[in-house]
């Protein structure tokens, strides 16, 4: 098989990233310029600030990706870029840069769905992973459980009806005074708490409906905190976040396991920033082992937004001849499976 070397660019939120990926599974470089320190003081991502920082960083990030990979533009077979979903201003920075490169170098342009990229991160760390399998996508903006039928072909089994899991983590973290980003801080503090101390609600729909809802548990936490403050009672933050985390993790795990049973799948892959959560990993591994289901995780660097996952997804699009036109535009509300 001829090697296909792809230069990939990701700028959908607050990471400016570029990577060089070979045949969808071998990463020669994966450079990420994070804005997390900038947005922390605002308590969350400020879209306009994110866009400006992408503009400042993108050229240097791409140059570093090429240098670390030991390749030049002449070695690149295609340019890949995230075009949605995400913050429209942030997306446009990466997209316009990639289009400029593709045009000037006369290379194919491949637009990639950001969520599909998260799923494809598993192909990098698990070289023998092939469809079909179930994937649980859990991030700050998205929560899906999908059946991956083939490369680039997905059946959405369940999705969030309101807050994404990562969004709920951020809001609860802010409420208890942990700040941003909430996911890692809750994960760390929860280890010191009793996850059975407080019974927070879990949204369970009918057996054949595997959608998610996290607004209820988020509101329950906020109500609990308000009541404790009104009574002037001491709040054990570790117990609060541990109990909240348990409620979220159990719903995520239950729906992933049920999807495996529904589609007769024996593999679950996890994707997205919340895939780094230690409680989620432990619970899924434990429940999967009970049922003979193999549970796969990307390495932490591939759970967060990165360009290597975009390069992986782009490779399989390239094999199918899915080349984007120069008229490709940013789609902030792009859904999984849409083009």
UniProtKB/Swiss-Prot annotation:
Signal peptide: none annotated. It comes from the Bacteria. One of its GO terms (molecular function) is iron ion binding. GO terms for biological process: tRNA threonylcarbamoyladenosine modification. It catalyses: L-threonylcarbamoyladenylate + adenosine(37) in tRNA = N(6)-L-threonylcarbamoyladenosine(37) in tRNA + AMP + H(+). Keywords: Acyltransferase, Cytoplasm, Iron, Metal-binding, Transferase, tRNA processing. InterPro entries: ATPase_NBD (IPR043129), Gcp-like_dom (IPR000905), KAE1/TsaD (IPR017861), Peptidase_M22_CS (IPR017860), TsaD (IPR022450). PROSITE patterns: GLYCOPROTEASE. The keyword Transport does not apply. The keyword tRNA processing applies. It is an enzyme of class 2 (transferase). Coiled coil: none annotated. Fe cation binds at residues 114, 118, 305. SUPFAM superfamilies: Actin-like ATPase domain. Required for the formation of a threonylcarbamoyl group on adenosine at position 37 (t(6)A37) in tRNAs that read codons beginning with adenine. Is involved in the transfer of the threonylcarbamoyl moiety of threonylcarbamoyl-AMP (TC-AMP) to the N6 group of A37, together with TsaE and TsaB. TsaD likely plays a direct catalytic role in this reaction. Belongs to the KAE1 / TsaD family. This is tRNA N6-adenosine threonylcarbamoyltransferase. The gene is tsaD.
